[in-house]
Amino acid sequence: NALKIDWETIVPKDRLSYIIGNPPFVGSKYSTPEQKKDMDVVFSPYTKKYRKLDFVASWYLLASKFMEGTSIKSAFVSTNSIMQGEQISILWPLIFDMGNEIDFVYKSFIWNNDANLKAHVHCIIVGFSSTSVTTNKVIYDNGSESKVSNINAYQIKAENIFIESRNKSISGAKPMIAPNKPCDYNHLKIEATEYDDFIKSSPESAKWIKRMVGAKEFIQNKERYCLWLVGITPKELRSMPIVLDRVEKCREARINANTSESLKLANTPTLFREQLNPDKYLIIPCVSSERRKYVPIGFLDDKTIPVMGTLIVPDATLYDFGILTSNVHMAWMRTVAGRLEMRYRYSAQIVYNNFPWPKVTEAQKEKISKTAQAILDARALYPESSLADLYDELTMPVELRRAHQANDKAVMEAYGMTKVVDGKKTWLTESETVARLFEMYEESTKN
């Protein structure tokens, strides 16, 4: 077991030049009890948060410790999540504090297991060594390579800054919150295929039914409904036997689940766990395809109930929408967000709350509000198209693309993200944009 033995008993440091390999691909949620014990031994002297790390992180820490004071170089094929989202700020400060730097990174690719064609893992290859060993760093990405002065844990050319999980926006932006969690065991939900029959059998129930939207329903324009019984009287409930039956089954399911939370919720069987129903809000899907340039976000009102798989910003404005749907925010999201396989995993704690908003004039704010409205207007030209179709790079309408480009320019101007090349004003590249945002983040959080 490589995590239990003293590596120097196998090869003395002074006889070793390289440590390379592909340690086991095991995500943090899938580690066996034995693997968890191994990680306890490796990480407990350094951090208490290691249970959120993938198993492969153990090899990174042991190699870093082993290489101290040597010219040894290490490289591992790894699950890509060790350089995504929350894991970054747990693992990589430990490695850098031991005097190591990233020498190269080969960005995400799929590792297929020939023995089991269903087994494929999204991987990266990371090379690292003492700060004094390698001066030329290289980023390998989609067939290209970039030589840079420093590679940080977000796989970009930037200083070694770490994005911490936060409960509030560093810029004072409106709170982004989790939506409703029904905890109804599907008894308060009404599928699209059930809706017509449900209404026919109980026409008076229509006033108590609202559309329910998770990420799939929002992006793919799928219809799904729920009983939203906030404020219903006992008399009204008893007048609708089909609704009362659903409520009774919800109560029974919560009791049978027999957890402290479900038993408490059994006392309110007419209700979801939360009763969030804002008049107007922005909705953001938590997981979205990496093939999209823009994560589809949009406005909904109190006729629609947001549920798990999304995040919401109540009382958001057009200006808020313009900033969040811009290429600036998307560049930030692509860099700091976690991933599900390769799909973006948007979070309030990492992506939204750490995002540096610009300091804008009223004129800039008004301009961004107008370009944001133009995006909504362009979508409205295609009422039969889902956001999945509108934001597919192959089928995105030209009006929508142009509206986004105009919004991108307005937002970049507000950030001052322009430069002069050959006497002409142009925009920062995505990597330059992210580097600037990291500088803004550091400035906002240094105190």
PLM features: residue spans?
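Signature of N6-adenine DNA methyltransferases within the class I
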Residues: 4-203, 220-221, 234-238, 301-310, ...
